[in-house]
């Protein structure tokens, strides 16, 4: 069975080809675009604009937003500990509500670096629930299993960081935050076990399992080497953070004087299978090596601003030939996962000043739509036509309310793409189509009852907090620890850790 969508404007390949008026997109039963052709007349009903769906190449599938947890305004190094303040609850509820929020805002491909485990069921069962949520919501996810074996409190051994924390909270901080190392082979085996379970459930088309080393400073060299070998053997993608903050840059220079990117290359991790989140403080020669090896960089503009990490050198990444993709990292500017607004913010910050053009619209669209699916699905599985509205491409589409965007129309000659870049936001999304299937219509996710899921999630979370007599004390401890860490990092950029 085929379906068709008529639109007033089609942006088939934004930046590479012009806007086309009065077009019909026909979608085949295989979930791919069968044809794109003029309608010959204006479509009846409300005017619509069709464009490729967006991708989020770095995120964590977080349940609650930063300010809900009291984490707003903190740098990453203290912000991290606030993420554990919400109690673990049903992982399906957590994932389905988070994924629904992303999908409503135009994201068809979503990277989930799963660093916040709910822990109310065995890990494999939790992962299966997350994959089931992706299927029910209708989004495609990359599911990177978080892997680490050191440094639970900072960028060095816990006993090095702990003396900077006030004495009365050290025991509780140690009990809750100290890393309990798991052997590299055991961590790698868990990834394989999860992949097997998700495939057996029939959800592999919605969840691509990946290795997710959290970062070099949180993973020992033996663990990173084991991941590199496993990725080479299986072809499985790898997703990790790199050089997100100034303190991570200082740590890297102290601990890898030969270069942290060269270190990744030397151990076989820097390959086309790798996505590196952030690289805010990467240097030109490091970016050149990343480009040469074919890895992808996921740039998270709002998150880097919100966590006071810096502004990524996106223009330099492009100049060096890096493949770059847009990430939201659970930290979009208004805490709403609005991918269209995130794209506009990145465009505003990175395109250049005055008459200088350091990023083209075509490159922007590669960043926002074409390159992200590769990070989510893996280099071997990504469709070369992703992020385009052309025959044969996956039918992953946004249908926007053109009446709402073009609400004060005066001049017929204006480029609709420029109006999109100036104004479009999540509120203008009339429909989201993934794989030829309508999954969002008029702001409502069709596969699940999102309001009911959110209500159930909040009820369970509030009940768990009320039943935990230590919850308030732990929140106070986290706030105290955040105060104590500031002087530590200001005194020594890498917390005195080697």
Where on the chain are the PLM-derived regions?
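Histidine-centered catalytic micro-motifs
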Residues: 52-64, 237-244
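N-terminal metal-binding scaffold of metallo-dependent hydrolase/deaminase domains
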Residues: 1-41, 49-50, 496
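His/Asp/Glu-enriched, well-ordered alpha-helical/loop segment
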Residues: 266-273, 315-404
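Histidine/acidic-residue-rich catalytic or RNA/ligand-binding cores of hydrolases
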Residues: 66-69, 153-156, 246-258, 286-291, ...
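Glycine-enriched alpha-helix->loop->beta-strand junction motifs that scaffold or abut catalytic
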Residues: 231-237, 269-272, 289-298, 319-324, ...
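C-terminal cap of metal-dependent C-N hydrolases
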Residues: 394-454
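Alpha-helical scaffold segments that flank or form the walls of functional sites
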Residues: 68-140, 187-204, 458, 466
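Metal-coordinating catalytic core of metallo-dependent amide/deamination hydrolases
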Residues: 125-277
């Amino acid at each position: 069975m085929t379906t068709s969508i008529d639109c007033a404007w089609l942006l088939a390949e934004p930046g590479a080809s012009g806007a086309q008026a009065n077009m019909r997109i026909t979608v085949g039963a295989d979930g791919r675009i069968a044809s794109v052709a003029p309608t010959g007349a204006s479509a009846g009903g409300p005017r619509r604009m069709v464009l490729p769906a967006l991708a989020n190449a770095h995120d964590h599938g977080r349940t609650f937003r930063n300010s809900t947890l009291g984490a707003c305004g903190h740098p990453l190094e203290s912000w991290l500990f606030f993420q554990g303040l919400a109690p673990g609850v049903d992982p399906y509820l957590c994932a389905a509500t988070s994924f629904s929020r992303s999908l409503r805002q135009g994201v068809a491909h979503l990277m989930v670096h799963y660093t916040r485990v709910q822990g109310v069921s065995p890990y494999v069962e939790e992962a299966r629930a997350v994959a089931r949520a992706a299927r029910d919501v209708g989004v495609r996810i990359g599911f990177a299993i978080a892997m680490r074996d050191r440094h639970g409190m900072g960028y060095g051994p816990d006993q090095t960081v702990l003396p900077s924390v006030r004495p009365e909270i050290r025991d509780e901080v140690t009990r809750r935050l100290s890393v309990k190392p798991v052997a590299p082979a055991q961590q790698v085996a868990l990834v394989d076990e999860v992949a097997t379970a998700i495939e057996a459930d029939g959800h592999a088309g919605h969840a691509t399992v990946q290795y997710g080393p959290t970062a070099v400073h949180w993973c020992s060299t033996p663990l990173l080497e084991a991941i590199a070998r496993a990725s080479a053997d299986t072809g499985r993608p790898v997703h990790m953070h790199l050089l997100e903050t100034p303190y991570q840059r200082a740590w890297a220079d102290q601990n890898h004087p030969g270069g942290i990117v060269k270190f990744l290359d030397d151990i076989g991790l820097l390959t086309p299978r790798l996505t590196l989140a952030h690289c805010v403080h990467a240097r030109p020669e490091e970016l050149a090596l990343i480009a040469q090896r074919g890895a992808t960089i996921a740039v998270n503009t709002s998150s880097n601003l919100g966590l006071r990490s810096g502004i990524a050198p996106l223009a330099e990444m492009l100049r060096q030939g890096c493949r770059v993709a847009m990430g939201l990292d659970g930290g979009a500017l208004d805490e709403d996962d609005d991918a269209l607004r995130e794209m506009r913010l990145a465009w505003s910050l990175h395109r250049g000043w005055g008459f200088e053009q350091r990023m083209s619209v075509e490159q922007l669209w590669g960043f926002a739509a074409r390159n992200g699916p590769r990070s989510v699905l893996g280099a071997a599985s990504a469709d070369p036509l992703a992020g385009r509205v052309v025959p044969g491409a996956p039918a992953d589409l946004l249908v926007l309310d053109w009446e709402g965007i073009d609400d004060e129309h005066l001049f017929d000659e204006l480029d609709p793409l420029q109006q999109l870049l100036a104004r479009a936001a999540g509120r203008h999304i009339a429909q989201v189509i993934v794989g030829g299937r309508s999954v969002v219509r008029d702001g409502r996710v069709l596969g699940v009852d999102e309001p009911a899921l959110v209500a159930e999630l909040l009820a369970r979370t509030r009940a768990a907090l009320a039943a935990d007599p230590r919850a308030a004390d732990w929140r106070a401890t986290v706030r105290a620890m955040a105060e104590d860490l500031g002087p530590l990092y200001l005194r020594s950029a890498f917390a005195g850790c080697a």
